[in-house]
Amino acid sequence: MGNYDSNEDVVRVFFKNKVKDVGLLIETMNNIVVEMIESGINIDKKTKVIIESNRYILAATLSAFELRKSKSDFYGLDNSTKSFESWLAKSSTIQLFEPLYERTRKLLRDRSRELGSSIDDNPEEYMRDDNINNKNTQQLIKRQSEQEEIRNQLCQIAEIAIEAYNDRIEYLRGSNKTEKELVNLIEKFNNKLRPSLIHPLVLINKSDIAFNLAEKHKAFRILTELCTNDNVGSIDRIKYYLDLFGNQFGFELFKWYVENGKLWTLFQYEESYGELLRNFFEQSDNGRLSWLHDLKTGSFNDASNTLINESSKETELAPKQVSLI
């Protein structure tokens, strides 16, 4: 640990001088895991290696975030004043989370393929089996428990990765160093990375976690896609988020309906969320639809003006005639 006063507490010295290198420790551990996997170890050994390495990485990162959250007021560490680069916000650290996530996700698929789909069942069902003391049953229950731990780890990795990328973005905003890196990172995070971290959780029966992450981070496009998912979405969830977030969620939801040609569904919200729908039409270029809303609400002058305005945009006579019908 280098030179230090032998009378000084070793743990205190570590946190004082070496905690900044935790990111390097995680990077080293990641490299070791990659080497072991590439050596061709069997599925049980691979499971043990990945589960244990994930435990260490998550223990370090989640503890760091929880500590900072609990002490942020005391140390004045709010998101608007991040001008320092924490070890979690370093580019070398955040780049580890994507392969960590994919490695863990792949392990779930590999185990299901090699060990059989029964490992994805609830182990409690087998614990009530008369053959509970059977060696094969005990092994299956053990593997089912491992599978559930891996699923939970995947959820935690998604959470910590999103937090770390948010940290990096806030640091770049506060430092005013690299505008190009900030723009590129925000685009990658919002359009590619964050969806790829949250959506797969639905496939492993962790849809509640997916909803919670999207809600917590106000990822309204992802929330919309989850709410309109035939398997996990519901009208109750949609109404909940419309009431909670108003225009922020509503605009993204209504935009999704327009993009996907679900206009009948869109106009179903007129009665309960008419004002929200009107705000959406007023702030978006959807005159071809907004006049229908105006007619439904009795705003005939607005409907007439909108139709005239829309027809003036047409360059051919036939579309004008159709638009004015």
Q: What positions do the PLM features span?
A:
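Extended alpha-helical assembly domains of large eukaryotic scaffold proteins
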Residues: I51, A59-I325
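Non-catalytic protein-protein interaction scaffold segments in large eukaryotic complex-forming proteins
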Residues: M1-E85
